Amino acid sequence: MTLLLTMLPPSPAERRRLLARARRLTQRALTLAGAGKLAEAIQCQDEVTAIRPEDATAFFRLGLLCREARRTEQAVEALRRSTHLSPGDRDPREALTETLVEASRYEEAVTEARALLKIVPKSLFARDALSISYLQLGKLDKALQVTGEMVWLDPLNPGHHFRRGLLFQQKSNLTAAVGEYSRALDMSHPESETYTDAEEALEMLDDDQTRQILLLASEDWFFLLKLRRDLAEAVTERGFCLSEGGLARLHHLIPHEFPDWIGDRPAPISWGARGRYH
């Protein structure tokens, strides 16, 4: 008999009492969180979800509190419940995706980000999470595809171009990398973090290539002569790609005291060619 009574739905009066308690607990959780008492806030909000197990917002709030307290598993569980109760709601899905990325659970993050794109097809947030996750999973082509979509949706955002530059650099496509870094530099405010990052990335690429170019020039006077005559063309012919600033710095490093008459002499026979005559 007692079991049957507990299985009966609450009376209207009891339901009103429980809803009022849930509201008080929700407000108390907010107050406690504002005071930095996250553990107590989580306890209050958890009780709200027990009173209202079908309330997606209650689980969403619990998930945010747990994430702030770095209780990752509990946060993921609460946010998943929220997305299950309200599958078309954007905010819980974004919070869940972000939590999974922060926890380095990239496969799961990809799944949630893809689900988010079904809700918000033009979501830059979802694509940002996808590009990070694909990069960490070693899926560079997919990461490039997603960042390409980000550039298309928001072409004036220098951060998108910088990320594409990083991906192109990882794929050893220096021409594309320099192009994207240069765009990021041109679009950024000189005091912004993106400007600094793009400037440092270009300088690093330029410095690495400049060392290789100067080494080649020290061993091949014919290449050195071509550098003196047409720097950009000579660099490109050898497969290098420097930024405008890199070309300017290289120009000042080329030894211009190299005798002009040496260009009239035939190029020396390489060791490989000489070997054929032995």
Q: How should each PLM-predicted stretch be described?
A:
Residues 15-57, 61-68, 95-98, 102:
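Alpha-helical segment of the N-proximal tetratricopeptide repeat
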Residues 27, 61, 95, 129, ...:
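Canonical tetratricopeptide repeat
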Residues 34-35, 68-69, 102-103, 136-137, ...:
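Register position in tetratricopeptide repeats
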Residues 47-48, 81-82, 115-116, 149-150, ...:
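Canonical positions in the second alpha-helix
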Residues 64, 80, 91-107, 111-149:
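Alpha-helical adaptor scaffolds
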